[in-house]
Amino acid sequence: MKLEVLPLDQKTFSAYGDVIETQERDFFHINNGLVERYHDLAKVEVLEQDRTLISINRAQPAAMPIVVHELERHPLGTQAFVPMNGEAFVVIVALGDDKPDLSTLRAFISNGRQGVNYHRNVWHHPLFAWQTVTDFLTVDRGGSDNCDVESIPTHELCFA
């Protein structure tokens, strides 16, 4: 099956999480007017007994064509990825309770200046780079195991 890759924007991505970007977002000045602060762009969630982690993930490019055959989710916290070197990247997401609901399966491509924050329990493809090795600032939770993985029928990404 083919899965069309759509441009990433907050309106079409909102059911799955937050788009982290400055374009068309409100800000206020800090540090004597030298800094524009784009405040509270994503809601980070972790359970009380856990803690929030900030990491850097170095992702390798996926082999072409990109084929999706499994999704994962994190029921105990959100997970955010922001590319650090301006590279576009692809995210694949689906809603669903115990298993991914394939009628909600979507793929998006960022513009290289956007990150994503997956809501708790949103099914998504494991992180990968699109065209070149990419470092991602990653914000997620530390604590016990927090990853459910499900196989899905194979889908090949289709770039418009």
Swiss-Prot record:
UniProt-listed InterPro entries: RmlC_Cupin_sf (IPR011051), UAH_cupin (IPR047233), Ureidogly_lyase (IPR007247), Ureidogly_lyase_bac (IPR023525), Ureidoglycolate_lyase_dom_sf (IPR024060)
Xref: Pfam families: Ureidogly_lyase
Disulfides per UniProt: none
Example GO BP: allantoin catabolic process
UniProt keyword list: Lyase, Purine metabolism
Protein origin, superkingdom: Bacteria
Keyword Cell membrane: no
Keyword Lyase: yes
Catalyzed reactions per annotation: (S)-ureidoglycolate = urea + glyoxylate
Pathway the protein takes part in: Nitrogen metabolism; (S)-allantoin degradation
Cofactor(s) listed: Ni(2+)
GO molecular function: ureidoglycolate hydrolase activity; ureidoglycolate lyase activity
Assigned EC number: 4.3.2.3
Similarity comment text for this entry: Belongs to the ureidoglycolate lyase family.
Protein purpose: Catalyzes the catabolism of the allantoin degradation intermediate (S)-ureidoglycolate, generating urea and glyoxylate. Involved in the utilization of allantoin as nitrogen source.
Subunit structure: Homodimer.
NCBIfam families: PRK03606.1-1, PRK13395.1
Official protein name in the record: Ureidoglycolate lyase
Gene: allA
